[in-house]
């Protein structure tokens, strides 16, 4: 219901803990028209002409996605539009079981901004080629395995890149 009241567009890229399957809430629930859920393990582009942008995404369709080619099909033309992507992926290890990707692969996409999920810690705002990318982390730590400042990213994204800033949000802070 909250997403139905939201006046914008929402996109969801299911990850390894909430992967897309016929039995998942993503498939079984009725979602508002302003919500797009990526259901394919391969990147898909959703055109948003009224917003002047294209939004890419891919879903986990199993608890593990070890294929490291998630970004090879993503090549954004220099067409004056903003090209965004939401992706649950792992930058930390080339042999990861959780959709391994590299900064070099990110740089080849031509995306304006890549919003990453998987790591629950803010990565800093990073750049590869013309693409800005980041893990925002999680808005609220859940235990002593999620230490440090938690929050979200806020900013502006356009055809030439993104200007993002971390906004602290958590009410609780876990520290050792």
At which residue positions do the language-model features occur?
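C-terminal functional module detector
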Residues: 144-176
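His/Asp/Glu-rich metal-coordinating catalytic cores
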Residues: 1-134, 138-151, 156
């Amino acid at each position: 219901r909250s997403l139905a009241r939201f006046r914008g567009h929402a996109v969801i890229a299911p990850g390894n803990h909430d992967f897309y399957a016929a039995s998942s809430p993503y498939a079984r629930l009725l979602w508002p028209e302003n919500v797009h859920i990526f259901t394919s393990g391969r990147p898909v582009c959703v055109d948003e002409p009224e917003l002047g942008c294209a939004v890419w995404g891919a879903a986990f369709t199993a608890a593990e996605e070890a294929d490291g080619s998630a970004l090879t099909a993503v090549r954004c033309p220099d067409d004056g539009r903003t090209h965004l992507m939401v992706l649950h992926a792992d930058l930390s290890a080339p042999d990861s079981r959780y959709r391994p990707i590299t900064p070099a692969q990110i740089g080849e996409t031509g995306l304006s901004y890549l919003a990453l999920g998987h790591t629950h810690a803010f990565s800093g705002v990073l750049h590869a080629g013309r693409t800005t990318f980041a893990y925002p982390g999680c808005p609220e730590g859940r235990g002593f395995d999620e230490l440090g400042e938690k929050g979200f990213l806020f900013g502006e994204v356009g055809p030439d890149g993104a200007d993002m800033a971390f906004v602290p949000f958590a009410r609780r802070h876990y520290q050792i």
